[in-house]
Structures are given as C-alpha cells and as structure tokens.
Amino acid sequence: VASLQRSVDSTDPANWSNTKLASRLMLVGVYGNGLGSIKPAVRKGLGGIVLFGTPPSNLAKQLAALRASAPGDRLLVSSDEEGGMVQRLTRLTGKMPTAKRIGQTMTPAQTQAYAYSYGKRLKALGVGTNLAPVADLKYPGSWTDRDGRAYKTNPAANGRYVAAFARGMQAAGVMATVKHWPGGGAVVDTHK
C-alpha cells in the first residue's frame, strides 16, 4: 500500500518539489551534436529541448534514446520550422518554402495539406512541437516581408493561413506554436 501511495504521489504535480515543477517547465536549446550532453538533465526531469544547429543524420534514434531516459518517457522535443531562413532540420526534412511564398502560391487548404505532410516528417524524427507558424502580418518593408516570414498583409487572410498551417501540423501529431504577436510586423488591435 505504501509503495502504491508513493507511486501515485510521484505522478501528482501537487506533490512535486518546486525544483521538479520548474524543471518540467524548462525548454532548453540543444545543438545537434550536443544531444548526449543533455541526457543527465533529461534523466532528472527536464521538460523539453529545442533543436538548433545541424542535426545528426541519426537524429530520430538519438531522440528516441533521449526520450527513453526521461522520467515516464516525457520529453517535449521542439524545432523551429517556419520555412525559408528559419528552418533547423532542412537536412533531414527537405526545404520548406517561406510563409510569403506559401501565401502567394497555395490556398489555405493546400497550406494545411503541406503542413500535414511536413509535420509527418517531423513526427517521424521524434519532434513533437513546431515553433511555428508566425502570425505577424506581412508589412511592406518590414522584416516579415523582407525575410518572407508572414503569409499575407490582410489580417483575416493571414489568419486563415496561420490556422491552416497549425491545423495541418496538429493533424500530423505535432503541436503548432503560433508566435510573435502582438509582434514585430504590422499588427491590428488584438483586443478587438
């Protein structure tokens, strides 16, 4: 009975120490060649990692081993896969066009299908969260336009593409992270 009670208590966050709670909320950046060095922190309950740098060719195998070392096999593995210049795993997933290019050449339905296909590649590698899409508006002359990191200038149209990308990722089993707003691009009043 005491053993069973300890087991129940260890899975209940209300019974966790502040250190354990904080570690589960941490997302640490790891360069592709440093996956082994993070293993001790993962064993102690680090909540997740964000992949940076050039990924090793055996990334899926390394991530599976890393996840297996996590308490309860719980490790959030994230990558930043917006497309264009912000894409960390190109060597393993292939290139994704910029959001600007997607907005020019695809419908929202095609965007969702593309994100689903790309999300399946991420999932196969062991990536469960994509730090994309960018929700900022494409504003002529801004970084979002220059770097191709936004779909559209019109808020409603942009929102359709952002939602389609997120739905595609999520259908593939990868969590999407809508980001940057109120943002660095042109934004509308988010309170309306």
Language-model features: locations:
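Extended, charged catalytic domains and RNA/DNA-binding interfaces, predominantly
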Residues: Q170-M175, K179
